[in-house]
């Protein structure tokens, strides 16, 4: 809760500010197209001719990176912007474009991906469709249900995603047939990174050097953990030459020092996966002529209070409803959000979401919250001001939060303050990343999620995965996420309907039902919606923003110039 004060102290360290630079908000996401957008400029068509290449560009990030090799989540997200090329990218209008591969489909069931001309691995070997197939098979062998169903130790079955595939004679195209049509399949490919078959095949382990063979415009030159730097240089095998010769990622332990470095010109931009500049820093940065801000309409959910619907206090829907009316959303929006922040709907997903429905706004209503507490059996308050049931037990729960995410801790503290003032006791469980994952994720808990409630931030990519609308975080059967532990048949039936959609109109119908379900049952709460505010040095021009990876995207390095 000290973030506002800390951010304001940065003012004393700034040089005298003149004015803020900004950009107009991007439009909302459009429905995905089965073909590449014809009227949207590609990065190649849009890139200017720079007066001279940029020798070195430094990106600040607070991402925790330990090994800098393929398979480390935070590194993979970072490297997706430089070396680990996804199949496609999504622009800020919500439209998809080829990156590593072009794509096509006739029926939303069989999707064909064709490797772009001239694409090679950094060791000189060509990228082929067999690399895509190998990656899917490798993931299958490591727990993903790509071509065969997977059964967990507890008997939970994840059905296979694909029913089959074909590869073209020239090995450059693969056609993947889904178990059921998915008009939104491209959203899953914005973060799908391909592995080199010739490196990994037949090996249980690979060396760090082998793990760093990639197919993007850059290759990893060095990782200095002590200095906190990750350096990428141009991949000479890439078919096009970017404007930036070298990209250095500077790892920071906290946001305060990172933003100060941006103001002082020590770094050129800041980046966090699917997250913009926190509202507590935006006023400070907006007043600095050395910093430019760009506002991007976002499809993520930056601040989520998720309930465990299967264990603990919040198996009782009345208590989830009570919390939904007891919270002060205007306080979250004002304190943590930007000037574009909004109070969310009870339907959870923001208006940029494909299939969005305008459900009722979340409101603060103590009398309604009190009615729901009484319906749950908590009719009186004790001497400490907390609701108690007939057995004299206080309404209390433990709220789990990742200690490494300062803003998330701020959300948790504000929830505790507000709910305890209302009459629900909140015990904060502030833990490290590993302990947090073990309590909040099916994958890392081995299908034994123990949190009663937790603070999450859902990425735009995650919100769109599976059936979309954040459903992977709600579905208790999801192999990786499933934090809300919802196994309700009504919910499952809606997911089946969405999965079976053969047209975008069919999908919209199912999406509307899912938002109505969220609004009626409150398995989770969005504390506020917001655009993403991205920050970079005012010395840069012609920056390109990606809907998934923000400023840290491959196309940016081909467009960005120095003023």
Predicted regions and their residues:
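N-terminal lobe/hinge region of extracytoplasmic solute-binding protein
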Residues: 60-107, 137, 213
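Detector for C-terminal structural segments
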Residues: 326-356, 407-416, 441-563
């Amino acid at each position: 809760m000290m973030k506002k004060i800390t951010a304001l102290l940065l003012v004393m360290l700034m040089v005298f500010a003149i004015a803020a630079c900004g950009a107009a908000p991007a439009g909302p996401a459009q429905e995905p197209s089965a073909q590449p957008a014809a009227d949207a400029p590609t990065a190649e068509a849009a890139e200017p001719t720079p007066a001279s290449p940029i020798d070195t560009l430094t990106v600040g990030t607070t991402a925790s990176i330990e090994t800098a090799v393929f398979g480390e989540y935070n590194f993979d997200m970072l490297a997706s912007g430089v070396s680990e090329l996804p199949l496609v990218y999504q622009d800020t209008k919500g439209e998809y474009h080829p990156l590593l591969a072009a794509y096509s489909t006739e029926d939303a069931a069989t999707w064909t991906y064709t490797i772009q001309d001239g694409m090679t691995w950094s060791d000189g070997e060509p990228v082929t469709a067999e690399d895509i197939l190998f990656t899917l098979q490798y993931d299958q062998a490591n727990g993903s249900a790509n071509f065969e169903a997977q059964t967990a130790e507890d008997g939970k079955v994840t059905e296979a995603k694909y029913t089959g595939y074909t590869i073209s004679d020239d090995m450059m195209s693969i056609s993947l047939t889904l178990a059921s049509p998915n008009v939104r399949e491209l959203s899953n490919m914005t973060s799908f990174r391909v592995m080199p078959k010739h490196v990994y095949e037949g090996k249980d382990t690979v060396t760090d050097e082998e793990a760093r063979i990639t197919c993007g415009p850059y290759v990893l030159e060095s990782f200095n953990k002590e200095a906190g730097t990750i350096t990428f240089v141009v991949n000479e095998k890439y078919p096009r030459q970017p404007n930036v010769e070298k990209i250095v990622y500077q790892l920071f332990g906290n946001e305060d020092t990172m933003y100060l470095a941006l103001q002082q010109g020590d770094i050129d931009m800041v980046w966090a996966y699917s997250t913009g500049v926190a509202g507590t820093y935006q006023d400070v940065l907006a007043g600095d002529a050395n910093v430019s801000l760009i506002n991007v309409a976002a499809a993520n959910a930056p601040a989520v209070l998720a309930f465990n619907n299967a264990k603990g206090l919040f198996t009782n829907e009345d208590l989830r409803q009570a919390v939904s009316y007891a919270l002060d959303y205007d306080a979250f929006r004002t304190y943590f959000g930007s000037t574009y922040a909004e109070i969310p709907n009870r339907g959870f997903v923001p208006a940029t979401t494909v299939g969005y429905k305008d459900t009722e706004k979340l409101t603060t209503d103590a009398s309604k919250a009190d009615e729901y507490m009484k319906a749950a059996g908590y009719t009186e308050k004790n001497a400490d001001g907390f609701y108690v049931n007939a057995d004299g037990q206080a309404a209390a729960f433990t709220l789990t939060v990742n200690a490494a995410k300062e803003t998330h801790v701020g959300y948790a503290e504000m929830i505790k303050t507000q709910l305890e003032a209302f009459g629900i006791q909140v015990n904060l469980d502030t833990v490290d990343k590993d302990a947090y994952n073990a309590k909040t994720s099916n994958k890392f808990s081995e299908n034994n999620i123990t949190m009663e409630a937790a603070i999450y931030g859902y990425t735009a990519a995650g919100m769109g995965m599976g059936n979309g609308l954040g459903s992977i975080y709600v579905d208790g059967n999801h192999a990786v996420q499933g934090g809300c532990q919802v196994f309700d048949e009504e919910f499952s039936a809606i997911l089946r309907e969405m999965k079976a959609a053969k047209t975008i109109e069919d999908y919209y119908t199912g999406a509307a039902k899912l938002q109505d379900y969220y609004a009626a049952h409150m398995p989770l709460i969005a504390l506020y919606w917001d655009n993403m505010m991205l920050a970079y040095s005012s010395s840069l021009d012609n920056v390109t923003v990606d809907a998934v990876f923000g400023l840290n995207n491959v196309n940016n390095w081909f467009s960005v110039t120095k003023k």
